[in-house]
Amino acid sequence: MASSSAPVHFGRYLSMFLVLFIGVYLLAFLTGDKRVVPRLGIDLQGGTRVTLTARTPDGSRPSREALSQAQQIISSRVNGLGVSGSEVVVDGDNLVITVPGNDGNEARNLGQTARLYIRPVLNSLPVQRGQDPKPGSPAGTLPNFAPMPPDHPGAQPRPYLQDPTSSPSSDPMPSPVPTGAALPGEVPSVEQPAPPDPRKDLAERIAEEKKWRQSTKQSIQFLALQFESTHCDKDDILAGNDDPNLPLATCSTDHNMAYLLAPSIISGDQIQNSTSGMNQRGVGYVVDLQFKSAAADVWADFTAAHIGTQTAFTLDSEVVSVPVINEAILGGRTQISGGDPPFTAATARQLANVLKYGSLPLSFEPSEAQTVSATLGLTSLRAGLIAGAIGLSLVLLYSLLYYRVLGLLTAFSLFCSGTIIFAILVLLGRYINYTLDLAGIAGLIIGIGTTADSFVVFFERIKDEIREGRSFRSAVPRGWVRARKTIVSGNAVTFLAAAVLHFLAIGQVKGFAFTLGLTTILDLVVVFLVTWPLVYLASKSPLLARPAYNGLGAVQQVARERRASAKTGRG
């Protein structure tokens, strides 16, 4: 047991909390959008809904298994970004994503197919906006394409998991032969044409796009590259549906360059992990990739054999990065840096997140964002806050009646805990997209109640020391030594329960568990850095040692009676 006579550096403890408090609020007021308001969930302020329509290369309906897998992957992406309170549901052949706030791009990005391929660059052209390639260019103007050697990694087809692609039939359907002429005066029956099938039409467009942009003929490849260089600002119908075993003519994400790429050498399913961070060799941010062992060997052999050449990283059929290989890259690690402009912290984190959880088994066409009204609204928020305020007031009233001045210290500690939790919630909403819903508010209220329990444990240990005959001044440090183990153990159990809920539960239960765990950690911070030093300072005051101020008169009376009984027994 620690000695009760050890020096107490109360000034150091209070200074540490003050630095933490000021630092958190400086970040809240001076960074980001500088709005010191927590990000509220869908149930309190509404959100944005985007419907993702599944599209398959052959025009068939998506399977339930593929939709369920896509739902799970998108849910993992949501959790990876820290976006709480979001909803991902299957609605027929569609996925409906609802996120808090009014940023529709966030919901669309969560539904990104994220099919990553690494392809060697064969040729490139700068984008020529406003110009169309002239049809019928003479063959003599074709550039000298680098021939693909037999040992090139892209020359041998590699197995990839992809949807089967069917080409539309080029043979027209035979016309029905009439069996007889219409009688005079009769109106010939005209068969109404069947309504066009949008899925079949889309499948035909994708198939035609593949024939044009993924041809193995050099002349067609050149025309496709020229065409792409003048149409990079158009929507890509092929997005996420390119065949990795064939060449590809496509554009960069910044729409400044068109590229002709060789077949893929590594696919995104060979990524073991992906993280984001600052670019140590330039500006902006990068995405760090760690390949699986088989892909790491392929990458090492390829980079060693192609020093000085360009290699493209394509995401959903667009080039996101075109690094030059300067040396052999061993260990299975590489980086993706953005184009012009470079990745920001948000875009790098988002790309790393979608690559970490894998590509979707389907490609989706997002709809326009729709505003969703709050399911509960600010009235429920106000009711929850009022309920919390009433409960907190009752706790403070009980503390003042039972502990007197120590109750005031309890109130001050709870104020410190509540204000720092508020600032942290603002920062979490700003940087990891955490949203506070009604379940999260319930977790906050219960967590603050746990903080009050810690004060009660401390004060009751002080009473136990006084019953044993010690003065208020000597009872405080001894009571703290006995109480802190109980406080740490109790908070550890609460935090463990919150952690289990957060990792195993879904939906709003995760928000409840998160705020409960957060307040549990801050409970320890406040008790150790605020409550304990303040109570120790109070024990040094002769005024606060009086029973009328500390509420310990009854306990001190019990101690005097015990001492008197002990003296009588010895006499």
Swiss-Prot record:
A Pfam family it matches: SecD_1st
GO MF annotations, alphabetized: protein-transporting ATPase activity
Major location (coarse): membrane
GO cellular component, one term: plasma membrane
InterPro entries in the record: SecD (IPR005791), SecD/SecF_arch_bac (IPR022813), SecD/SecF_CS (IPR022646), SecD_1st (IPR048631), SecD_SecF_C (IPR048634), SecD_SecF_C_bact (IPR055344), SecDF_P1_head (IPR054384)
Subcellular location: Cell membrane
GO terms (BP aspect): intracellular protein transmembrane transport; protein targeting; protein transport by the Sec complex
Keywords from the UniProt entry: Cell membrane, Membrane, Protein transport, Translocation, Transmembrane, Transmembrane helix, Transport
Transmembrane segments: 13-33, 383-403, 408-428, 439-459, 487-507, 512-532
Topology term for the membrane: Multi-pass membrane protein
Annotated region described as Disordered, given as residue ranges: 124-199
HAMAP family per UniProt: SecD_B
Function: Part of the Sec protein translocase complex. Interacts with the SecYEG preprotein conducting channel. SecDF uses the proton motive force (PMF) to complete protein translocation after the ATP-dependent function of SecA.
UniProt similarity note: Belongs to the SecD/SecF family. SecD subfamily.
PANTHER family: PROTEIN TRANSLOCASE SUBUNIT SECD, PROTEIN-EXPORT MEMBRANE PROTEIN SEC
Subunit annotation: Forms a complex with SecF. Part of the essential Sec protein translocation apparatus which comprises SecA, SecYEG and auxiliary proteins SecDF. Other proteins may also be involved.
Protein name as it appears in the record: Protein translocase subunit SecD
